């Protein structure tokens, strides 16, 4: 059987080990070819090929349910659940999603994108099954990185107290998340997988035995001895999970189909919660990825032979993340109070550079955004200048801590929100749409966004120097605009002050962050139609520069707000509130992301679909100006 013939995972039933190995090779080949061509997650999926095949051969996927934590390791799952023919569309507009998506396949039982959710969701399914008197298996596959997340440990704690609730947790232990794992749990798991008795008993035991004199004759007795020794070792290394109420099995060689099949069959016999500890290699089967597991966690299109990214058509300016990291390092070198904090995203945020240069001023808390926020709050209490560098979408996970531990106590924590706005191929779980809305409503919070990478440097200085309370800066994924950068001598910006970039009497364009450059392009287009626009770089969504905005709105009378974020509760809403508070009844048109999910596509495709290209915005503004009402005031 060829991989292309598999449209249902139950077709794996009855296949021999040899046939499964052939399918495994074909999965890796398809996986590599697709990611090399279009980009995507590489290492995670390559590491779970045998795990996926062995697990699915022991399940009835017409009724049993498997949830993959995060989902970026689920490419093999997608390839054997009817998506082989469309897999070349991976992460492309209207194509196969890069993560699990309930709308995409009946085999994607729970959507994901953020870590540590699988055990909770699978336990919920198991409890619902039992309440309805049904009979199917529920399985969570979770990485050792995600297992460090508090939510996963909360679910383990709950499930362990339900001895008659049948569920299986598979711990995919490759000693990595995106970057190398940190923390006591990671250290414990590493000790388990490297335990000498288990290493000895797992490494080609039978093959080595047969090479000894009389090896064939004593093999049965020694295999029984091996089993006893391994159970003794496991009783020690699996003690934490056993004490929490799980039956622990492992560590198991995650690339041995024989061992995986036997283990999963055994695990399915237990009535209560079971944890199978599977040791895998991230990037398995592609030597370049195995040797550099951080870089090859995910890749843009690359050359399979060399592993190097395919050259772009033209050189790009440095990314916002790179400018952020390099500027932060220079500030940290001059102030030992400055500490960079990340939640398992050192490479993505650029803080790996800070770690390399100033390791004592760098903290990685693991996949623990809640802890990162309150840790920063505690450091701020002692006069430190904590800089929490985190993706916009992931800061959502620490929201209560932002309110309870930072804002209520008015502590000077600096939140740097990378990947704010439209991020592209990762889809709705990773879009940075909501931070303006969810931070703007919090007392004491200051919010700013740079128009370009040079202003990011100024805002970084502003945030670190600001000691009157919490402050946040959002900035996008990808390259800057190519403006000149200063090596030093940055001056902090006055809090809550905007800047006027262009003057005109026909329409007021109030832009925030990345939309400032677009507003300038729109103004150029409007000029060609005889329309003169005032363009304002708001800089701050909170506090708004009402001293500048209110008189301009009164004078010009037609206001358009521009933001790369959700419209409900966003920057445009803030402007509307300010105008109403000042009894200015100028018409306001808010342009941004409407109240909908933004699916996976390139950022340019998403912006075009949302009407956020310069030409689309200019056309909309021209339509507004056909009937321009005069400004008025509330009586």
Swiss-Prot record:
Classification via InterPro entries: Dxylulose-5-P_synthase, THDP-binding, Transketo_C/PFOR_II, Transketolase-like_Pyr-bd, Transketolase_BS, Transketolase_C, Transketolase_CS
Reactions catalysed according to its record: D-glyceraldehyde 3-phosphate + pyruvate + H(+) = 1-deoxy-D-xylulose 5-phosphate + CO2
GO terms (BP aspect): 1-deoxy-D-xylulose 5-phosphate biosynthetic process; isopentenyl diphosphate biosynthetic process, methylerythritol 4-phosphate pathway; terpenoid biosynthetic process; thiamine biosynthetic process
TM regions (residue ranges): none
GO molecular-function term, one example from the UniProt record: magnesium ion binding
EC number: 2.2.1.7
Coiled-coil features, chain-numbered ranges: none
Residue numbers binding thiamine diphosphate: 72, 113-115, 145-146, 174, 286, 369
Residues the record lists as binding Mg(2+): 144, 174
UniProt pathway annotation: Metabolic intermediate biosynthesis; 1-deoxy-D-xylulose 5-phosphate biosynthesis; 1-deoxy-D-xylulose 5-phosphate from D-glyceraldehyde 3-phosphate and pyruvate: step 1/1
Free-text cofactor note: Binds 1 Mg(2+) ion per subunit.
A cellular-component GO term for this protein: cytosol
Cofactor(s) annotated in UniProt: Mg(2+); thiamine diphosphate
Enzyme category, top tier: transferase
Protein keywords: Isoprene biosynthesis, Magnesium, Metal-binding, Thiamine biosynthesis, Thiamine pyrophosphate, Transferase
Pfam families membership: DXP_synthase_N (PF13292), Transket_pyr (PF02779), Transketolase_C (PF02780)
Record bears the keyword Protein transport: no
Presence of the UniProt keyword Lyase in the record: no
Record PANTHER family: 1-D-DEOXYXYLULOSE 5-PHOSPHATE SYNTHASE-RELATED, 1-DEOXY-D-XYLULOSE-5-PHOSPHATE SYNTHASE, CHLOROPLASTIC
HAMAP family (UniProt xref): DXP_synth (MF_00315)
Family annotation (NCBIfam families): dxs (TIGR00204), PRK05444.2-2 (NF003933)
Similarity-based family: Belongs to the transketolase family. DXPS subfamily.
General function of this protein: Catalyzes the acyloin condensation reaction between C atoms 2 and 3 of pyruvate and glyceraldehyde 3-phosphate to yield 1-deoxy-D-xylulose-5-phosphate (DXP).
Subunit note: Homodimer.
Protein name as catalogued: 1-deoxy-D-xylulose-5-phosphate synthase
Gene name as annotated: dxs
